[in-house]
Design a protein with these regions (language model features):
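Short beta->alpha linker loops
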Residues: 23, 46-50, 86-87, 108, ...
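Asp-based, Mg2+/Mn2+-dependent phosphohydrolase catalytic module
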Residues: 1-7, 93, 109-111, 115-217
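Ser/Thr-glycine-rich phosphate-binding loops at phosphate-binding pockets of nucleotides
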Residues: 16, 20, 106, 170
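Conserved SAM-binding loop
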Residues: 17, 84, 102-105, 139, ...
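Short, structured helix-loop boundary elements
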Residues: 48, 70, 85, 89, ...
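N-terminal helical cap/lid subdomain that shapes the substrate entry/recognition surface
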Residues: 2-98
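Short phosphate-binding/catalytic loops that engage adenosine nucleotides
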Residues: 98-100, 179
């Protein structure tokens, strides 16, 4: 840790800040049943991937199908429930009180996030410092680009950053960025992610600035 640089906390969004992953699993499982019945548990298969990655891998050349899926997804995201992961707001407020910079670093696009801001304007009004979306980086998770951008916008170094992630791709990206990674067992089990993070937690209840700083040593 470089004490001449600020500390930054970089949060994935779905399954880390908002309790949305279960809803997405239902949506994508239905898409999988319709278009890829040979791939069971399609929702789990595409976790942590951008829409572009999903289309490139599973719907390449299927322009009409992509348009239909996107339209359905946009409707779904307008109507989905947006509830915070337990304890995350209090944790963010604790971080801000101690001068920690906070960014949401998400594979979601601006269209989806506009729905989020409408429901939770506090995200744009001081709860976090920056929100980095899929349009802002060339390579998506598991590449480290998004988290490295998080460090860059705050003028700090990877060793001063803590990443909070739930998906395998996100955990891999945080590690590839050379950052301390905390795993949320909201999407995958604690057992499944334990080797991919320095600490796994079920939510943010009881987690605070001091506990985070202890991970940085």
């Amino acid at each position: 840790m470089d004490k001449t640089k600020c500390i930054a906390a970089l949060f994935d969004f779905d399954g880390v800040v908002m309790d949305t992953e279960t809803q997405y699993t239902v949506y994508w499982d239905e898409v999988g049943r319709q278009y890829h019945p040979e791939l069971p548990h399609f929702g789990a298969l595409i976790k942590g991937q951008t829409l572009t990655q999903i289309y490139d891998k599973h719907f390449a050349g299927m322009t009409e199908e992509q348009s239909k899926i996107t339209a359905r997804l946009n409707r779904f995201e307008r109507e989905m429930t947006l509830e915070y992961i337990a304890g995350v707001v209090d944790f963010m407020k604790d971080l801000r009180a101690h001068g920690v910079k906070i960014a949401i670093v998400t594979s979601s696009n601006e269209l989806k996030m506009a729905n989020v801001y409408a429901a939770h304007p506090e995200l744009k009004e001081g709860l976090v410092d920056r929100i980095l979306t899929a349009e802002m980086f060339t390579r998506s998770k598991p590449a480290p680009d998004c988290f490295l951008l998080g460090a860059e916008v705050f003028g700090t170094l990877p060793q001063n950053c803590v990443v909070f992630e739930d998906s395998f791709h996100g955990l891999e990206a945080g590690n590839a960025a050379g950052m301390t990674v905390v795993g949320l067992s909201t999407t995958n089990t604690a057992e499944a992610i334990k080797d991919k993070c320095k600490l796994s937690i079920p939510d943010f209840v009881g987690f605070n600035y001091e506990k985070m700083m202890a991970l940085l040593g």
